[in-house]
Amino acid sequence: MSMSFFSHNYLATYRKRWGLSQRQLAYLLGWDSASSVSRFESMGRLPNLMTALKIEALFESGSGDIFPGLYRRAEIEVADRAKVLYRELEGRTDPKSQEALALLAYIIRRS
């Protein structure tokens, strides 16, 4: 997958759907400048956790819906690490390892 796929987001779509200007969205998110919104919309800047939560609260949509490319990138990275950890734990029979293996298998299957 190309990097442009991972940088795709719908922040501008959500903002425009609700008739907000970049300046108005910046205000709602507690920012001083509309240029910050522009950078997020063009993925020149990645949202930190608080920003992502504010955007979710504002539009009542999950980060994965608003930032699907970024979400997919995170999903792939987690799945890749889950595969490595699964191989490390494979063969262990203690209950905690079995629980972890079940979670890791689920993560790998859904990726």
Show where each model-derived region lies.
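Short, solvent-exposed alpha-helical "recognition" segments
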Residues: 44-49, 75-77
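Short, charged recognition helix plus adjacent turn
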Residues: 67-111
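The short coil/loop that forms the "turn" connecting the two helices of the helix-turn-helix
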Residues: 20, 31-32, 61
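A short, Lys/Arg-rich alpha-helix, primarily the initiator
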Residues: 1-18, 103-109
